[in-house]
């Protein structure tokens, strides 16, 4: 039975590990992270109804004076 030649295993494992590391780094570097939400669209919004511009107080029936 012939002896198994293991002299190239170190080179094969090392090259595979380096290749896998490079591929994973490339995959991670192309991944886009979400940006934080900004308020630029809220500043452009203007209310169109007159009741949205002023504050109104709503009374609860239980808070009204009882006769």
Swiss-Prot record:
Record GO cellular component, one term: mitochondrial membrane
Record PTM N6-succinyllysine, positions in chain: 54
Residues bearing the modification N6-acetyllysine: 54, 57
Major localization class: mitochondrion
GO aspect biological process, one term: proton motive force-driven ATP synthesis
GO MF, one annotated term: proton transmembrane transporter activity
Annotated membrane topology: Single-pass membrane protein
Alphabetically ordered keywords of this record: Acetylation, ATP synthesis, CF(0), Hydrogen ion transport, Ion transport, Membrane, Mitochondrion, Transmembrane, Transmembrane helix, Transport
A Pfam family it matches: ATP-synt_8
InterPro entries according to UniProt: ATP8_mammal (IPR039017), ATP8_metazoa (IPR001421)
Location(s), subcellular: Mitochondrion membrane
Parts of the chain that traverse the membrane: 8-24
Top-level taxonomic group: Eukaryota
Known function: Subunit 8, of the mitochondrial membrane ATP synthase complex (F(1)F(0) ATP synthase or Complex V) that produces ATP from ADP in the presence of a proton gradient across the membrane which is generated by electron transport complexes of the respiratory chain. ATP synthase complex consist of a soluble F(1) head domain - the catalytic core - and a membrane F(1) domain - the membrane proton channel. These two domains are linked by a central stalk rotating inside the F(1) region and a stationary peripheral stalk.
Subunit structure: Component of the ATP synthase complex composed at least of ATP5F1A/subunit alpha, ATP5F1B/subunit beta, ATP5MC1/subunit c (homooctomer), MT-ATP6/subunit a, MT-ATP8/subunit 8, ATP5ME/subunit e, ATP5MF/subunit f, ATP5MG/subunit g, ATP5MK/subunit k, ATP5MJ/subunit j, ATP5F1C/subunit gamma, ATP5F1D/subunit delta, ATP5F1E/subunit epsilon, ATP5PF/subunit F6, ATP5PB/subunit b, ATP5PD/subunit d, ATP5PO/subunit OSCP.
Matches recorded under PANTHER family: ATP SYNTHASE PROTEIN 8
Homology family: Belongs to the ATPase protein 8 family.
Entry protein name: ATP synthase F(0) complex subunit 8
Organism in which the protein naturally occurs: Cricetulus griseus (Chinese hamster)
């Amino acid at each position: 039975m012939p002896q198994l030649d293991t002299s190239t295993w170190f080179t094969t494992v090392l090259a595979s590990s380096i290749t896998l590391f490079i591929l994973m780094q490339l995959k991670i570097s192309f991944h886009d992270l979400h940006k934080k939400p900004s308020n630029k669209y809220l500043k452009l919004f203007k209310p169109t109804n007159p009741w949205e511009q002023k504050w109104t107080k709503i009374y609860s029936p239980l808070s009204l004076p009882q006769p």
